[in-house]
Amino acid sequence: MARRPRPAGSEPDSGIPHIVELVRSTIPPIHPAGLPFIAGGLGLAGLGVRNRWVRGTGLALAGACAGFFRHPPRVPPNRADVVVAAADGQVCLVDRAVPPPELGLPAEPLPRISIFLSVFDVHVQRVPVAGEATAVIHRSGQFLSADRAEASVANERNSVQIRTRTGHDVIVVQIAGLIARRIVCHAKVGDQLSIGDTYGLIRFGSRVDTYLPEGSKILVQQGQRAVGAETVLAELP
């Protein structure tokens, strides 16, 4: 049976602490935003302890929410001047588009990479590039299906503009979807953000757009799967 590699000279742990550590390393932690939903499912199961259908429904709901709000650790690349995926999902667009007008930027198209998150994907968002948050703006809107091109213009969204140490601006936009009705963003103007750190979450299916500075070298293509904080989307100029 295959075993986890250990440093030379170290002795393997045994007993309950070892088992607990194995479980913790296998099951990803839960984002705090999901705890009320999981508690609701467990509460339903508790109320229906004498009814197997109610109990089963509650446990299934709690399990589904635990899976949806999972928050696995990620290791971003240590390469300089790269932009990583801000979310898990499928690259649904690689094109050029004007950034959200509420940011007050010139109305000129920039390279854009859009990632669509299904309900089965990890739904936390990661910082795509290290730098300072120079703008964080929420805009109310519609709740069209997030895989539609017009969703980036019409839907509720939250935009974060990040200025890198070399002066490049990268914009990451959380977009609500047909089912997603709640955008969570913890970043604030003036925050120093580290690449790969978790900064927000969108509940139940959504999309994340990343706008790049001119001259960036895009390294992904439409239809490709992306892993948040680890897949390199582009190299900055």
From Swiss-Prot:
Its record classes its membrane topology as: Peripheral membrane protein
The Gene Ontology CC terms held by the record are: plasma membrane
Q: How is it modified after translation?
A: Is synthesized initially as an inactive proenzyme. Formation of the active enzyme involves a self-maturation process in which the active site pyruvoyl group is generated from an internal serine residue via an autocatalytic post-translational modification. Two non-identical subunits are generated from the proenzyme in this reaction, and the pyruvate is formed at the N-terminus of the alpha chain, which is derived from the carboxyl end of the proenzyme.
Q: Per the UniProt record, which EC number(s) apply here?
A: 4.1.1.65
The record places the site described as Cleavage (non-hydrolytic) at: G205, S206
Q: Which reaction does it catalyse?
A: a 1,2-diacyl-sn-glycero-3-phospho-L-serine + H(+) = a 1,2-diacyl-sn-glycero-3-phosphoethanolamine + CO2
A single BP term in Gene Ontology? phosphatidylethanolamine biosynthetic process
Which pathway does this chain act in? Answer: Phospholipid metabolism; phosphatidylethanolamine biosynthesis; phosphatidylethanolamine from CDP-diacylglycerol: step 2/2
Where is it mostly found? membrane
Identify residues that carry Pyruvic acid (Ser).
Answer: S206
Location in or out of the cell: Cell membrane
By sequence similarity, the record places it as follows: Belongs to the phosphatidylserine decarboxylase family. PSD-A subfamily.
Q: Write the protein's name.
A: Phosphatidylserine decarboxylase proenzyme
Q: Which organism is it from?
A: Mycobacteroides abscessus (strain ATCC 19977 / DSM 44196 / CCUG 20993 / CIP 104536 / JCM 13569 / NCTC 13031 / TMC 1543 / L948)
